[in-house]
């Protein structure tokens, strides 16, 4: 990621700096902006929210969490989000502002579904809401060479 990659006159580096983001283990940059003070019976917060930014060439590596995750598009280029329930049957959606082109401003990834994302331009800023709250203890990052295996046809 570098200053040469711009969207609406702002580079990904500048957006990262202005929002106080830090590198995320799955790729991209993030900052937790909210963690609900209410907890469930196990003491886990009921929800959490982050900013998440992917720049040109950044990939949110294949991963899954044990909770529903809502992706909310905020700014920048559209985002390609690919989800896969069982390691075989995947679907891709584009998050963004161009509703006529089929983009949508949000998408829900069900609990335990595999997911990966990339920016379709210079950079993309999304928010991710997880309920119950995100916890790295309940986060699984796929091995670097893991890919879904289509049953009949290509991904």
Which stretches of residues belong to each language-model region?
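Non-catalytic, conserved peripheral segments adjacent to functional cores
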Residues: 2-108, 116-117, 121-124, 128-155
């Amino acid at each position: 990621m570098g200053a040469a990659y711009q969207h609406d006159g702002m580079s990904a580096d500048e957006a990262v700096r202005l929002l106080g983001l830090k590198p995320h283990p799955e790729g991209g940059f993030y900052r937790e902006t909210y963690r609900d003070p209410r907890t469930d019976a196990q003491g886990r917060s009921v929800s959490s929210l982050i900013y998440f930014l992917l720049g040109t060439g950044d990939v949110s590596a294949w991963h899954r969490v044990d909770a529903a995750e809502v992706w909310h598009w905020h700014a920048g280029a559209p985002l390609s989000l690919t989800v896969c329930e069982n390691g075989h049957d995947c679907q891709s959606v584009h998050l963004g502002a161009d509703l006529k082109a089929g983009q949508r401003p949000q998408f829900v990834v069900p609990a335990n579904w595999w997911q990966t994302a990339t920016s379709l331009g210079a950079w993309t800023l999304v928010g991710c809401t997880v309920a119950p709250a995100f916890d790295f203890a309940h986060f699984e990052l796929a091995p670097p060479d893991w890919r879904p295996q289509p049953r009949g046809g290509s991904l």
